[in-house]
């Protein structure tokens, strides 16, 4: 078993979700900026911080820098723990404590021992993409995620349209038949040719008024 093949993607909402980041270096700074931009409440604990943290603290109300020493009880206040220190002994201790408390944690120094991984993410109007590659190569993840976003943007209008259809047929007996019809290469072809309304009217005229 390994953490790459034995994993599943979960989209974590930033609304009312508190995250503790242990560390104040460049790695912690990158993770902090990513999480702040997604609306999470982020508290960072370290004896000292990279100077760029001060700029973040002035720009984000959902960021708090904590200079006090670490205590085990502190972990109870947070939904997710992110380990970003270069102290292997300390990191190992935090992993053990988190496991004993059934806390989800990300160890950026040992992703293979983490309960979660912070994937590269990108969003278009209607599609969110998360990407993880095997091993540690964050620049490759970001590069491929950017390419994926550009590709998926072409489907934004299609996704918006079929989601509207999906929400309008939830009480119909032939719902699954309709969903299989619109979620297909054939229907996508006609959508891209701007003939999707005509095709729906031909096969499912009752949907046009919706």
Annotate each predicted stretch with a short phrase.
Residues 1-14, 119:
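A short, basic/flexible loop-to-alpha-helix module at the beginning of a structural domain
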Residues 8-33, 46, 161-176:
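Glycine-rich adenosine-cofactor-binding loop
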Residues 30, 38-56:
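NAD(P)-binding Rossmann-fold cofactor-contacting core
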Residues 39-43, 79-88, 127-136:
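Short beta-strand and adjoining strand-loop segment in the mid-core
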Residues 58-73:
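Glycine-rich, highly charged phosphate/nucleotide-binding loops
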Residues 80-86, 91-117:
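ADP-ribose/adenylate-binding Rossmann-like module
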Residues 102-156:
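E1/E1-like adenylate-forming module used to activate ubiquitin-like modifiers
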Residues 133-210:
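An accessory alpha-helical subdomain
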């Amino acid at each position: 078993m390994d953490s790459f093949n034995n994993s599943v993607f979960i989209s974590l909402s930033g609304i009312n979700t508190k995250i503790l980041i242990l560390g104040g270096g460049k790695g912690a700074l990158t993770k902090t900026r990513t999480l702040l931009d997604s609306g999470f409440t982020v508290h960072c604990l370290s004896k000292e911080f990279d100077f760029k943290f001060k700029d973040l603290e002035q720009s984000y109300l959902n960021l708090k820098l904590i200079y006090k020493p670490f205590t085990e009880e502190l972990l109870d206040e947070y939904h997710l723990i992110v380990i970003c220190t270069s102290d292997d002994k300390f990191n190992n201790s935090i992993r053990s404590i988190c496991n004993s408390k059934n806390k989800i944690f990300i160890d950026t120094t040992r992703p293979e021992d983490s309960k979660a991984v912070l994937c590269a993410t990108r969003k278009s109007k209607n599609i969110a993409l998360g990407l993880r590659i095997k091993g540690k190569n964050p620049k490759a993840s970001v590069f491929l995620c950017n390419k994926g976003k550009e590709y998926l943007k072409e489907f934004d209008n299609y996704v918006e349209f079929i989601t509207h259809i999906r929400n309008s047929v939830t009480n119909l007996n032939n719902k699954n038949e309709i969903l299989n019809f619109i979620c297909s290469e054939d229907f996508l072809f006609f959508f891209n040719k701007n003939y999707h309304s005509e095709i729906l009217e031909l096969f499912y005229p009752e949907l046009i008024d919706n």
